[in-house]
Regions:
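Conserved active-site "lid/cap" helical segment
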Residues: 2-93, 101, 105, 162, ...
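Condensing-enzyme catalytic core mediating Claisen C-C bond formation in acyl metabolism
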Residues: 2-35, 179, 210-276, 280, ...
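Conserved catalytic cysteine-centered active-site region
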Residues: 13, 63-158, 196-222, 254-256, ...
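Short acidic, glycine/serine/threonine-rich loops at helix termini
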Residues: 31-32, 125-131, 189-193, 259-261, ...
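Beta-strand segments within the central parallel beta-sheet cores of soluble alpha/beta enzyme folds
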Residues: 54-63, 84-87, 114-119, 175-183, ...
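Short glycine/threonine-rich loop-to-helix capping motif typified by GTGT followed
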Residues: 66-77, 260-265, 299-322
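Active-site-proximal alpha-helical scaffold in enzymes
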Residues: 90-120, 156-190, 230-236, 345-366
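Extended C-terminal subregions enriched in glycine
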Residues: 267-302, 311-314, 343-347
């Protein structure tokens, strides 16, 4: 017996569910709000965006690194009586994973409409990118035993090994990958919500101080305080909501290695989970990379965007440096990426603001940074 998934099975849920509401607080550095307040405000904003009352939401999901609030508290603040909730310890891909879980629990009849949130004081309190958080102190277990003894305490330190390996194997250069920051800064300059709106150059990136080779300061995301939320429901309910629903065509979860300590296990270390997930993702969605007009990537670092776009099949393995430096991902290019500025410029939300941005793109709500085709019309 194996664990292979039949990507063409009739059980897939293509087009049966949609994101109907999105909400967020400001992306700031320094707030007088705790994460409970941020989450409550974000979920309320998403409900208002969808045109839903507290009586019409009955499920709630969230993720954190033990740095946030819980669903029952937020639901209580909003007067929501929950039929289902779950709070998970998650990472950068948890938004998409929880979208899949929301679809599953609705399909199972456990609830009807699910709010998903991430709230974090990622600058003023728990800074994921630093080395002084609670997770860096003893006692350690699991993957932490492999890395912490050698000084691998931050995400940048751990990811840098993958980036260096890609440079070694394929000749990728920091100059090429710096274009990710350049392009995302161009997009953020159009976005009034972005924390960093200033455009930068490749020289700006490479002359910023070194954090851990090959990452310079401007290769790294912008730590911010924020709350963000989305709402998922069935497509038939979605049509009664305030905006055109953003239909969900496919959701896939896949780990690249059995354990989180990616660099201490067999197999390539410069390949991300998208390499393994794409053969399920695309058939389930009924489209391929060539059909996509705009993308959203988890840009915790410039290099992570490059690896994701490569491993999801937008270019061949080893050609990611050429792809991101070609201009294809900027507004006016063939396939704009992170049109709000992403984590590198709009603000770090642990993965959810790219989903919010793409929902707005699909609805045509983003006049200042919406991809525009040669004929002047929006293309989605």
């Amino acid at each position: 017996m194996d664990n292979d998934i039949d990507a063409t099975a009739g059980k897939h849920l293509r087009g049966k569910y949609a994101v109907v509401g999105v909400g967020e607080t400001g992306y700031v550095r320094g707030t007088d709000c705790n994460t409970r307040t941020l989450a409550t405000r974000a979920v309320r904003a998403a409900m208002e965006d969808a045109g839903l009352s507290n009586l019409e939401v009955d499920g709630m999901l969230s993720y954190s690194n033990n740095d946030s609030t819980t669903s029952p508290l937020v639901a209580g603040d909003l007067g929501i009586r929950l039929n289902f909730y779950m709070d998970v310890y998650g990472g950068g891909s948890s938004t998409e994973a929880l979208i899949g879980i929301a679809m599953g629990v609705i399909e199972a009849g456990m609830c009807n409409t699910v709010a998903i949130f991430r709230a974090m004081n990622g600058y003023s309190q728990v800074r994921i990118g630093g080395t002084g958080g609670a997770g860096t102190r003893a006692p350690l277990s699991g993957g932490g035993l492999f890395g912490r003894a050698y000084g691998l305490m931050s995400a940048g330190q751990m990811f840098s090994q993958s980036f260096m390996r890609h440079m070694y194997d394929y000749g990728t250069t920091p100059e090429q990958v710096a274009m990710v920051k350049v392009i995302h800064s161009e997009h953020a300059s159009n976005n009034p919500k972005a924390y960093y709106k200033q455009r930068v150059t490749v020289d700006d990136v490479l002359s910023s101080r070194m954090i851990v080779k090959p990452l310079h300061l401007l290769d790294c995301c912008v730590e911010t305080d924020n709350g963000t939320a989305i709402i998922v429901t069935r497509i038939d309910r979605a049509r009664d909501c305030r905006h055109t629903p953003a239909a969900i065509q496919s959701v896939v979860g896949r780990c690249s290695k059995p354990r989180a300590d990616n660099h201490y296990q067999a197999g390539p270390i410069s390949t991300v989970a998208g390499h393994y997930a794409k053969d399920i993702l695309w058939p389930n969605a009924g489209v391929g990379p060539e059909d996509i007009d705009a993308t959203g990537s988890y840009d915790a670092f410039t290099f992570t965007t490059m690896l994701q776009l490569e491993d999801y099949g937008f270019c061949k393995k080893g050609e990611g440096g050429d792809y991101v430096s070609s201009g294809v991902t900027r507004l006016g290019g063939e396939r704009p990426n992170n049109t709000s500025g992403g984590h590198l410029c709009e603000g770090y939300t642990h993965g959810i603001n790219m989903v919010i941005e793409n929902v707005r793109q699909l609805r045509g709500d983003v006049d200042d940074s919406c991809p525009v085709g040669p004929d002047g019309k929006r293309q989605h």
